[in-house]
Amino acid sequence: MKKIIALILSAVTLSVSAQTDESDNGVVSLAGREGFSIKSKKGDFVFKPYTLIQTAAKYNWYDDEGLDKAYNQDNVMNSGFAIPYAILGFTGKVYDRISFNLCINAAASGGALLQQAWFDVKANNALSFRVGKFKTPYTHAYLTTLGETLLPIVPTSLTTNVIMPHVLNAVNPTIGTGFDLGVMAHGLVANNKFSYEAGIFNGTGAGVNSATKTLSDDIKGLPSLFYAGRIAVMPFGYMPTSQGNPNNLNDKKMIIALSANTNVEAQSESTNDTRAGFEFAYMVNKLYFATEFYYMHIGFTDRQKIDDTFDYWGGYAQAGYFVAPQWQVAARYDFMDRNATSKDGIINMPAFGFNYFIKDTNLKLQAMYQYMGRKGHDTQLDRDNDDLGLATHSVTVMLQYAF
């Protein structure tokens, strides 16, 4: 028995060291933390467990529109304490050719409980294939590592449902896409200054882990799936998927990216959705700046017998600056044409906040305030409808632990 144990210990070593490189699991913050990994003696096998826990205090105040005072509905709703993410997972690689990641979000339910489950096969730096459940290649805001975002809430223009004067077979879509099941080719070329992603996904989102799609009735023979692509230029080398890291305050990185996708027979075969986006992000020393602009076109499937089409757009600009080694101040201006270009008026969401990275504890404290404004609507009814379900005043304070 002692010989067997000795052989195992000689083949596998447990290393406990500071983790300064970015782990490609797309989930946890590596800022200022120490972790451990199990690694074979030759480095052919690496296994790393991780966790991310977020607890938030929220205050949301809503306008009177949409509230029924007869039922004593209050202006303050959806407030209190919440756990946005409680993630437990592990990631690793084998022979520097295959990497893998599996994690659950215990704060979610249904299919979203499984947040990620994928493996990545690397032919070379220019060509790899990822299969499973992972982030779709669309928008800098979503592709940022969870836990390394500038503010605790991603831009509202990506997460809020659009408005249209028709009833779909499912909820109205959002411009953002997020996690999905599929396969994707990706790679880095030109000394890591150019990247690409091209993938096919179910198009049903993070809450569905089964195959539910069919062939398109409108485009004969085409599977009713989600087709996505993204290209990016990084003039100063690979851009880390972070929006602020106190361990990386002496670097210079930039990314300019274009992305596009189409979801065939989305919303339970109600619509065909096409999206496009532009991304720009810049990090130099203590400063981080990013801006995005995105667009979505919705056309109805033939079976809906609706001739209307709708176009939506949105975007944001945000900046963060480390005023001290552990303190980052943040501001964002977010805007969206939620009721489609066929009607006048937009919503805009200015926000500001701060991040405090508590040294040597793996803790990160985030706080933000966001205001919901409306501008340019033709009628008061249009103005009232445009922010239904969205808080006029929103405050979030979140404490995060990552390991």
List where the protein language model places each region.
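Short, well-ordered amphipathic alpha-helices
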Residues: 33-35, 227-242, 352-355, 398-400
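Outer-membrane beta-barrel pore domains
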Residues: 20-26, 118-122, 223, 248-403
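Outer membrane beta-barrel
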Residues: 36-62, 67-69, 73-206, 223-238, ...
